[in-house]
Amino acid sequence: MVTKRTLLAACLLTVLIVLGAGVVLLGGCARKETVAVPVAVEEKKEDPGLHQAAEEKIAGYTRPEALISVYELNRRLEDSGTFIIDTRGRSFKVLQASYPFGHIPGAVPVLHSNYCHPAYPGRIAAPLQLQDFLGKCGAGAESNIVLYGNDGLQARLYWALKMYGFDNVKILDGGLDKWKEAGYDVATASSRRPPDTFEFDLADSKAEQTMAVFNDVAAAVGDSGCVIVDARRNDEYLYKHMPGSVNLSSEELFNQDKTFKTAPELKVLAEAKKITPDKKVIVYSNAGVRSSLVWFALSELLGYPEVKNYDGSLQEWIKLERETEKSLQTKPVTLQ
């Protein structure tokens, strides 16, 4: 009897070891990351009606290729060309508090500083620096890049890529929150890709059409053919803003679920602020981040022909001792 028990225990131990090894091997095959899969959680079935409604909304924008719904991304998740970037890393501390606690499977995390100019803190990186960084992250010339975030950095990186001539890029409508709401899995382990070759075709650079510099803004002040848009919160605008600017806060662009409002809703919102497509538009914030969201809405979603994002934004304007206007005495908490 003792011998039989001993043999039975040995067999059970062998089975457990084999199963454990199998789990480890399987975990190492999924996009080079180990994903924590919830146990005994019922899979949420996709609602075809929600998917269709999301696609119809996106189709209503001037450039529908600029956005992707969570439903469509889920279908493309295993495509080898899909390259997802998590832009929530405003700082290393923020990245540590967000990415390891849940991200879209396969998403590569980036820090804001990774695509900032080393000599001009907060300014966008030069094209050679940015392409080298993206290549090291694993993005290639044929990658289908999808960006998601929650504070405007997704739009800033989108703006930079488009400015330097790379068009195969989209923003995830609703970001990670919408992804979770749809019931899709999230990963917790870091995702890495082998380095690739990523190069901008600078012959297609749109820098002159998409980025405003100080002289552009100075010339626009007082010009009836131009409108300067402040993308910050209203309390920030009231405390201090560029002369003659109008306030269209980036927060006004979104629904409660953090998806963009429809094209007709955005159009009404912009025109109520006297922001019309017949004018040259320059958008600013504190450091060119939130202004990227308003640039994206006006340029990509509504198709305004002349919209520029002021990279230096209010930080540069004040540093150069240019005039500002104010009507609120209490200084608010400011963002980028």
Residue ranges of predicted features:
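Solvent-exposed loop/turn segments at secondary-structure junctions
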Residues: 89-92, 113-117, 150-154, 176-178, ...
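N-terminal secretory signal peptides that target proteins for export/translocation
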Residues: 1-4
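Terminal peptide-recognition signature
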Residues: 73, 107, 161, 179, ...
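C-terminal soluble interaction/assembly domains
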Residues: 268, 278, 282-301, 307-314, ...
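Positively charged, proline/Ser/Thr-rich regional signature most characteristic
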Residues: 55-142, 216-278
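Thiolate-centered catalytic microenvironments shared by cysteine-dependent enzyme domains
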Residues: 33, 37-60, 64, 124-212, ...
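Bacterial N-terminal signal peptides
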Residues: 11-24
